[in-house]
Amino acid sequence: RGLGDVYKRQVKSMLDFDYIGVHPTGVVLVDQDRTGHKIHGVPVVSNLANVAEYVCREWFDEVLIVLPEDREIPQKVFDAFTEMGITIHVKIADVNEMQGKNQTVERMGNYTVITTCINMASAGQLILKRIMDICGGLVGCILTGIIFLFVAPAIYIKSPGPIFFSQYRVGKNGRKFKIYKFRSMYMDAEERKKELMKQNRVSDGLMFKMENDPRVIGSEKGPGKGIGNFIRKTSLDEFPQFFNVLKGDMSLIGTRPPTVDEWEKYELHHRARLAIKPGLTGMWQVSGRSEIMDFEEVVKLDTKYISEWSFMLDIKILFKTVLIVLGQKGSM
């Protein structure tokens, strides 16, 4: 028999993969004695019965064992490699290359598993991000208190009622939480939203954006007028969310949390943007903010942020956000 395609494919996989400092120097076939033949230039050096003796006499640093699911390496061969102090790698699964995904091998109970996720952040990185959130949340809550002294009377005079607006949003991996804002709309805003859906600039209903929203406090004075438009344009309405950041519902940087009704319309790939905690600001906000009307573009930017996340990327987005807010360009 000739050498099977399976063996050729496995050897080629080793040669093609960019192993640092590792070079295949020999192959052993478990069901054939083809000593002396070559597969893609790599010699078949022994059969299974004599492989331990061969490895003992030759120069080998490591052994990679790749077997089909219905075959097991004889325990005496495995024990022989261990006794010789050889580093052994055993294939536990065939994993297809997944673009933009990260994989690692972990222990879960008695199982050795391959973990695949959109971002493989370390515990240290997550702790650093949380420390930044706590520090930012504390400062933000203090600023929120100061802003409250000026904004609260202006809101109440124009629209008597609660100063704060709260609403359930969908956070990391589908967890629901209550988000807080300074109220920039009249009390019946949620009821009127259904009437205004035809004017939604995002056609699929996965976000709600419209020009000159009549629900905004003071909007009857004209486009961009009134206290409601002012606090939205300057993003002052978002400051109470620093309390959400401090609680741990949100992060300073992340993806914007959808409303429950928006989330219920999500397709499978949309859920990827919920793989991390939602944030006060994020990549799509600093890449166009309210000017982006294509939800698929939002999802693309959000998943790009998640897969490429680093602490320095958060710092860059944070500084860009400050510059954009100071320039009053759009709303968060």
List where the protein language model places each region.
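N-terminal hydrophobic signal-anchor/signal peptide
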Residues: 1-145
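Residue-level signature of catalytic and energy-coupling elements of molecular machines
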Residues: 2, 63, 88, 146, ...
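Generic recognition of well-ordered alpha-helical segments
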Residues: 12, 46, 53, 83, ...
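Short, glycine-rich, amphipathic interfacial segments at transmembrane boundaries or analogous
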Residues: 33-35, 95-96, 101-105, 164-218, ...
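Compositionally biased, charge-rich terminal segments
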Residues: 120, 296-311
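A hydrophobic, helix-centered structural microdomain
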Residues: 124-192, 244, 311, 316-332
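A short, structured surface patch at a secondary-structure boundary
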Residues: 205-277, 317-325
